[in-house]
A protein has these predicted regions:
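NAD(P)+-binding Rossmann beta1-loop-alpha1 motif at the extreme N-terminus of oxidoreductases
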Residues: 1-49
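Internal alpha-helical scaffold of NAD(P)-dependent oxidoreductase catalytic cores
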Residues: 36, 40-43, 120-165, 170-207
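Interdomain hinge/lid region at the active-site interface
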Residues: 202-221
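Rossmann-like NAD(P)(H) cofactor-binding subdomain of soluble oxidoreductases
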Residues: 34, 44-120
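Short active-site oxyanion
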Residues: 1, 24-28, 58-62, 82-87, ...
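Short phosphate-binding/catalytic loops that engage adenosine nucleotides
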Residues: 24-25, 104, 150, 190
Length: 221
């Protein structure tokens, strides 16, 4: 299957690399910046472009991984002339029906994880949630996701919205607390590394205990 990526950010970079390693053919990468487009394209042996009108019309699957606002704004331009291919986005918070009226075949491929370009992740353990407007494409997306991960689920847009919100609490807000802790420690000349055993144990606990049962310290009170 030939795949084109619209976007070359943190998620797109990790997903494209994972698909490439599993033998999928990435034919092109689009990003508005040459550095991002070319960097990812070279890694997965693909062409690249920084112009939406130059995005290939020959791919069988288009994976859109852009910031939410940019995706909504650029959607008509992105799909122009390529309406008969399968289109998916990777966002947790955007409903599947955003595609409706723009393309015939569409869906969502949502790997629920925190991604950074500079850090490789083990896709085998990442939960992947799929959705499509046809049963045939649901199965196709499940097959693609299953090539990467042992944990593949079908989830509706409403379910995925809740997953995304839960992930924000679990990851983004938690990491922001680390930022605040690091700033406090720095102010008093203490290393953030002193927090790492505490961070690790806190994370390990919820593998064995319900989050409420694992809560200790001032937060209990």
């Amino acid at each position: 299957m030939s795949i084109a990526f619209i976007g070359a950010g943190n998620l797109a970079t990790n997903l494209a690399k994972a698909l490439y390693r599993k033998g999928f053919r990435i034919v092109q990468v689009y990003s508005r910046t040459k550095e991002s487009a070319q960097g990812l394209a070279q890694t997965v042996e693909a062409a690249y472009t920084t112009e939406l009108q130059a995005v290939t019309k020959e791919a069988q699957l288009y994976i859109v991984s852009l910031k939410d606002a940019a995706f909504v704004e650029l959607l008509p331009q992105i799909v122009s002339g390529k309406e008969n291919a399968l289109w998916v986005h990777t966002a947790g918070s955007i409903p599947m029906n955003i595609w409706q009226g723009h393309v015939a075949r569409y869906g969502v491929l949502y790997p629920m994880q925190t991604f950074s370009k500079q850090r490789e992740v083990d896709f085998g353990q990442i939960p992947c949630f799929v959705e499509s407007n046809s049963e045939e494409d649901v199965q196709l997306l499940k097959d693609i996701a299953s090539a990467l991960s042992e944990k593949v689920y079908e989830a509706s847009s409403e379910q995925r919205k809740s997953l995304h919100l839960a992930a924000v609490f679990t990851c983004n807000f938690t990491n922001h607390m680390y930022v605040l802790a690091a700033e406090l420690l720095k102010k008093y000349g203490l290393p953030f590394e002193a927090m790492l055993p505490l961070i690790d144990e806190t994370a390990r606990k919820v593998h064995e205990l319900e989050p409420l049962a694992a809560q200790t310290g001032p937060a209990v009170r």
